């Protein structure tokens, strides 16, 4: 995080201290998180709008003004995109969220998606996927928060746990982290890809430790989840920042008839390269901006601005992508307007 944003952060802290909210608004380090649903009723709409997360949109809102005008002829731009997506891809996606910050110290909310697609096998109707990313243990996420995260994940009763990388802030934290996460037992196991932090340090140790605890690291590999004679595919991307080595997506050799979930650290990858045969991509890296005030994030970890900042988006090929805010932090242990979250996805088969 660059020094130029320190005045911005100071101004933000002063603003928060002056707010009238009396419920779960923390203005002191090390954990600074503000959720829209924690603003009391007498707080003005202006203040409430400052920190409103924009994760649950049904389309990428960075469309041209001309496209917006065309869409408004019959319906809103979001509805127009949703309708088009239903026709062209046989897909329907809805979302909701649950505030858990009063119960779990490590996570602020659970964001739930119902993902309906024509290629979901009948055996996987109602299949539940838990997705976490960017734990950065021990940054904002400390031991108590990690234990609470584990309790929350166990309570979700997921069928599989997927992880998006950037696990640690030091190699000494690798074993304690995965030892705790190993308590989360799911019928289909735990899969994970590496983040940029994990390639900078501790990569081999993370791979060994994951395998030691029965987890499955995916480095440009695919694995098959089987149930009642049917299957879905998990495709994991190795270092998505090195396109020279990894610019060929592991999904290219897969069948378009399979339901394929791509697991990748940065959302930019789904736009940088062809990810054909992918039905749903999951990514992290952006932290949802980590600090967002007046709808502005001073640091964007994407070459595409706010297009893939958080929540549901689409690449140019109209492949859906869910980007999580993640859980931990980098540089400074502060989150404002970008709540730490767990993603839960329930698969449904489109009945045509």
Question: What spans do the regions from the language model cover?
Answer:
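Positively charged n-region of N-terminal signal peptides that target proteins for export
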Residues: 1-5
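Bacterial N-terminal signal peptides
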Residues: 8-15
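Acidic, histidine-bearing metal-coordination/catalytic regions of metal-dependent phosphoesterases
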Residues: 19-128
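Extended active-site neighborhood of metal-dependent phosphoesterases/phosphodiesterases
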Residues: 90-92, 97-102, 114-116, 179-243, ...
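Membrane-embedded segments
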Residues: 106-108, 120-208, 213-216
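Beta-strand-turn-beta hairpins that frame and shape the catalytic cleft
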Residues: 108, 117-130, 215-216, 223-236, ...
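Active-site neighborhood of phospho(di)ester-bond hydrolases with catalytic His/Asp-centered motifs
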Residues: 132-133, 160-166, 189-196, 218-221, ...
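Conserved beta-sheet core of the metallophosphoesterase superfamily
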Residues: 182, 267-346, 350-352
């Amino acid at each position: 995080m660059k020094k130029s944003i320190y005045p911005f952060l100071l101004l933000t802290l002063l603003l928060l201290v002056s707010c009238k909210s009396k419920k779960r608004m923390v203005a002191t380090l090390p954990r600074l998180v503000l959720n829209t649903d924690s603003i009391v009723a007498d707080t003005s709409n202006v203040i409430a709008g400052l920190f409103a997360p924009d994760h649950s949109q049904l389309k990428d809102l960075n469309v041209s003004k001309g496209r917006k005008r065309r869409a408004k002829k019959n319906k809103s731009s979001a509805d127009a995109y949703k309708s088009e997506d239903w026709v062209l891809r046989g897909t329907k996606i809805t979302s909701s969220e649950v505030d858990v910050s009063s119960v779990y110290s490590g996570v602020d909310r659970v964001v739930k998606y119902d993902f309906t697609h024509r290629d979901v096998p009948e055996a996987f109707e109602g299949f539940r996927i838990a997705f976490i990313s960017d734990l950065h243990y021990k940054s904002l996420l400390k031991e108590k928060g990690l234990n609470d995260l584990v309790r929350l994940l166990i309570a979700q009763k997921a069928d599989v746990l997927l992880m998006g990388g950037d696990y640690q802030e030091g190699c000494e934290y690798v074993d304690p982290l995965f030892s705790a996460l190993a308590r989360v037992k799911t019928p289909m196991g735990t899969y994970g890809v590496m983040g940029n932090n994990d390639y900078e340090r501790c990569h081999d140790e993370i791979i060994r430790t994951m395998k030691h605890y029965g987890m499955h690291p995916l480095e440009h590999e695919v694995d098959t989840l089987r149930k009642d004679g049917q299957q879905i595919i998990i495709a994991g991307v190795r270092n998505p920042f090195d396109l020279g080595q990894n610019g060929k997506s592991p999904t290219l050799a897969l069948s378009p008839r399979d339901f394929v979930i791509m697991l990748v650290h940065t959302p930019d990858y789904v736009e940088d390269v062809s990810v054909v045969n992918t039905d749903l991509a999951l990514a992290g890296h952006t932290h949802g901006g980590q600090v967002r005030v007046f709808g502005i994030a001073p640091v964007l970890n994407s070459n595409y601005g706010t297009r893939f900042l958080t929540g549901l988006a689409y690449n140019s090929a109209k492949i859906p992508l869910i980007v999580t805010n993640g859980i931990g932090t980098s540089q400074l242990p502060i989150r404002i307007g970008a709540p730490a979250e767990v993603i839960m996805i329930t698969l449904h088969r489109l009945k045509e």
